[in-house]
Amino acid sequence: MNKILAANQTLTSEAVSEGHPDKIADQISDAILDEILKVDKNAKVACEVIITQNLVVIAGEINSPVKKTLDIKEIAKKIIKDIGYTNIDYGLDYKTITVIDAIGNQSQDIINAIKKKGSNALGAGDQGIIFGYACDETKNFLPAPYELANSILKKASNLRKSGAIEWLRPDSKSQVTIEYDKNRRPVKIKNIIVSHQHHPNISQKLIREPIIEEIIKPTIQDKSIIDENTTYCINPSGNFVIGGPTGDTGLTGRKIIADSYGGFARHGGGAYSGKDATKVDRSAAYMARYIAKNMVAAGISKEFELQLAYAIGIENPISIQITSGINDPKYANKILNFIVNNFDLTPNGIIEKLKLKQPIYLKTCTYGQLGKNEFEWEKLDFVKKIQTVLKK
């Protein structure tokens, strides 16, 4: 992103909960991917879900013998149950859903493009523009509004599932606006929005205080960035009783900004969920994040954005570019040469480095695809080498 040149400018990010209709679809897509990978590590999967009312339609293309034995309906039901949709009054009920399986086979043309006969190499599963980003605003190297927006909803989910706040229901969204100084450092939370589905028999007056005092404030680590001027918009539309797929149709891949950096970085448009690692929309996005995070952690810059571009069937990226964080062209070229010579950016190289044949994807797809330190692409194991070669 461009540098902020004036003080008192604000930046905003949003997040959605696991019970948001689009996120239900993402989770079903990734749960299906995981179940296939448990048996077939080399499966090719592109799974798309649409969910509306009490209907789930599962489509896409899968190339794996596991498809024949996969219990699609049970996978979908388990996800919906685990989220907390156990009563149709919530907007969905796992016990009564209708599931339509419309999954087809992967195109033979695509199969041939990805895997050439007589070669172990993998070409990219599609063309695409991919970005990876990191900044030094938080300990997870993510933008502060984005991290806080997700943390608020995770806290709400924990309190809902534990029964600590009984009137909460699964569907929710948040949005955080933070004021920055002229050096682009976060200095104050200006506004927090939380829209949370709730039981019909509770008033908005009784909803407001628990959301602020039990969910929002305990989530904010740095108390100095909130004050009496911080405003809270809690269910600004009024009642939020009708939620889940009864209120809105959900679709896989429709929350790509909430999945990545909350609007702080560019996005090539490709979604993550339901895709195996030959799809560079997902795997190369993880790799670009890994590189960017290690660059910022090494002190190369306060923020770093990397663009990768691929062509279907071709191993190596056709373009690599630093798109934010480095202003010196000569230094940028030195960094690019380092990236090319030290990181394998082919699909095979990325899959091996980041261990992407494992059934890990359901864990990635809620509350941000990035910033979860359990995953390989969040490791800071390249920092020392970067500092040795590149640190000015």
Swiss-Prot record:
<comment type="function">
    <text>Catalyzes the formation of S-adenosylmethionine (AdoMet) from methionine and ATP. The overall synthetic reaction is composed of two sequential steps, AdoMet formation and the subsequent tripolyphosphate hydrolysis which occurs prior to release of AdoMet from the enzyme.</text>
</comment>
<keyword id="KW-0630">Potassium</keyword>
<dbReference type="InterPro" id="IPR002133">
    <property type="entry name" value="S-AdoMet_synthetase"/>
</dbReference>
<feature type="binding site" description="in other chain">
    <location>
        <begin position="171"/>
        <end position="173"/>
    </location>
    <ligand>
        <name>ATP</name>
    </ligand>
</feature>
<feature type="binding site" description="in other chain">
    <location>
        <begin position="254"/>
        <end position="255"/>
    </location>
    <ligand>
        <name>ATP</name>
    </ligand>
</feature>
<dbReference type="InterPro" id="IPR022631">
    <property type="entry name" value="ADOMET_SYNTHASE_CS"/>
</dbReference>
<keyword id="KW-0554">One-carbon metabolism</keyword>
<dbReference type="GO" id="GO:0004478">
    <property type="term" value="F:methionine adenosyltransferase activity"/>
</dbReference>
<feature type="region of interest" description="Flexible loop">
    <location>
        <begin position="106"/>
        <end position="116"/>
    </location>
</feature>
<dbReference type="GO" id="GO:0005524">
    <property type="term" value="F:ATP binding"/>
</dbReference>
<dbReference type="InterPro" id="IPR022629">
    <property type="entry name" value="S-AdoMet_synt_central"/>
</dbReference>
<keyword id="KW-0479">Metal-binding</keyword>
<keyword id="KW-0067">ATP-binding</keyword>
<feature type="binding site">
    <location>
        <position position="248"/>
    </location>
    <ligand>
        <name>L-methionine</name>
    </ligand>
</feature>
<feature type="binding site">
    <location>
        <position position="248"/>
    </location>
    <ligand>
        <name>ATP</name>
    </ligand>
</feature>
<comment type="pathway">
    <text>Amino-acid biosynthesis; S-adenosyl-L-methionine biosynthesis; S-adenosyl-L-methionine from L-methionine: step 1/1.</text>
</comment>
<feature type="binding site" description="in other chain">
    <location>
        <position position="279"/>
    </location>
    <ligand>
        <name>L-methionine</name>
    </ligand>
</feature>
<protein>
    <recommendedName>
        <fullName>S-adenosylmethionine synthase</fullName>
        <ecNumber>2.5.1.6</ecNumber>
    </recommendedName>
</protein>
<keyword id="KW-0547">Nucleotide-binding</keyword>
<dbReference type="Pfam" id="PF00438">
    <property type="entry name" value="S-AdoMet_synt_N"/>
</dbReference>
<dbReference type="Pfam" id="PF02772">
    <property type="entry name" value="S-AdoMet_synt_M"/>
</dbReference>
<comment type="subunit">
    <text>Homotetramer; dimer of dimers.</text>
</comment>
<feature type="binding site" description="in other chain">
    <location>
        <position position="106"/>
    </location>
    <ligand>
        <name>L-methionine</name>
    </ligand>
</feature>
<feature type="binding site">
    <location>
        <position position="48"/>
    </location>
    <ligand>
        <name>K(+)</name>
    </ligand>
</feature>
<feature type="binding site" description="in other chain">
    <location>
        <position position="61"/>
    </location>
    <ligand>
        <name>L-methionine</name>
    </ligand>
</feature>
<keyword id="KW-0460">Magnesium</keyword>
<feature type="binding site" description="in other chain">
    <location>
        <position position="20"/>
    </location>
    <ligand>
        <name>ATP</name>
    </ligand>
</feature>
<dbReference type="GO" id="GO:0005737">
    <property type="term" value="C:cytoplasm"/>
</dbReference>
<feature type="binding site">
    <location>
        <position position="22"/>
    </location>
    <ligand>
        <name>Mg(2+)</name>
    </ligand>
</feature>
<dbReference type="GO" id="GO:0006556">
    <property type="term" value="P:S-adenosylmethionine biosynthetic process"/>
</dbReference>
<feature type="binding site">
    <location>
        <position position="275"/>
    </location>
    <ligand>
        <name>ATP</name>
    </ligand>
</feature>
<dbReference type="Pfam" id="PF02773">
    <property type="entry name" value="S-AdoMet_synt_C"/>
</dbReference>
<comment type="similarity">
    <text>Belongs to the AdoMet synthase family.</text>
</comment>
<dbReference type="InterPro" id="IPR022630">
    <property type="entry name" value="S-AdoMet_synt_C"/>
</dbReference>
<dbReference type="InterPro" id="IPR022628">
    <property type="entry name" value="S-AdoMet_synt_N"/>
</dbReference>
<dbReference type="InterPro" id="IPR022636">
    <property type="entry name" value="S-AdoMet_synthetase_sfam"/>
</dbReference>
<keyword id="KW-0963">Cytoplasm</keyword>
<dbReference type="GO" id="GO:0000287">
    <property type="term" value="F:magnesium ion binding"/>
</dbReference>
<feature type="binding site">
    <location>
        <position position="271"/>
    </location>
    <ligand>
        <name>ATP</name>
    </ligand>
</feature>
<dbReference type="GO" id="GO:0006730">
    <property type="term" value="P:one-carbon metabolic process"/>
</dbReference>
<keyword id="KW-0808">Transferase</keyword>
